[in-house]
Amino acid sequence: MRISATLLCLLLIAAAFSIQVWAQPDGPNASTCCYVKKQKIPKRNLKSYRRITSSRCPWEAVIFKTKKGMEVCAEAHQKWVEEAIAYLDMKTPTPKP
């Protein structure tokens, strides 16, 4: 009986540590963007973007925000992604000092 209690205690401690590891900022979450969309999104539907780099993802990715509020991941080095980024950069006015 004593061995069972000890094993249960060790299991609970291991579970607590694994939860903390997954809760770290570099833990896996939707923003790591490892699941990317290969299909081209029309530029007119895009509102903004942000670049994502993570040690948990093997490639650099971009998250596009559409005019309808959806977020779509895409691989940063695809030609259509680079064109969409250039398009959004041209649309966004640069602030004057």
Curated annotation (Swiss-Prot):
Record-linked SMART domains: SCY
Pfam families registered for this protein in UniProt: IL8
GO biological process: cellular response to ethanol; cytoskeleton organization; eosinophil chemotaxis; immune response; inflammatory response; positive regulation of natural killer cell chemotaxis; regulation of cell shape; response to gamma radiation
InterPro entries listed in its UniProt record: Chemokine_b/g/d, Chemokine_CC_CS, Chemokine_IL8-like_dom, Interleukin_8-like_sf
Residues with attached carbohydrate: N29
Predominant location: secreted
Residues carrying Pyrrolidone carboxylic acid: Q24
Key words of the record: Chemotaxis, Cytokine, Disulfide bond, Glycoprotein, Heparin-binding, Inflammatory response, Pyrrolidone carboxylic acid, Secreted, Signal
Cysteine pairings via disulfide bonds: C33-C57, C34-C73
SUPFAM superfamilies: Interleukin 8-like chemokines
GO molecular-function terms, A-Z: CCR1 chemokine receptor binding; CCR2 chemokine receptor binding; chemokine activity; heparin binding
Signal peptide: 1-23
Recorded GO CC terms: extracellular space
Intracellular or extracellular location(s): Secreted
Family designation: Belongs to the intercrine beta (chemokine CC) family.
Assembly, per entry: Monomer. Interacts with TNFAIP6 (via Link domain).
PANTHER family in UniProt: C-C MOTIF CHEMOKINE 7, SMALL INDUCIBLE CYTOKINE A
Function summary: Chemotactic factor that attracts monocytes and eosinophils, but not neutrophils. Augments monocyte anti-tumor activity.
Protein name (record): C-C motif chemokine 7
Gene: Ccl7
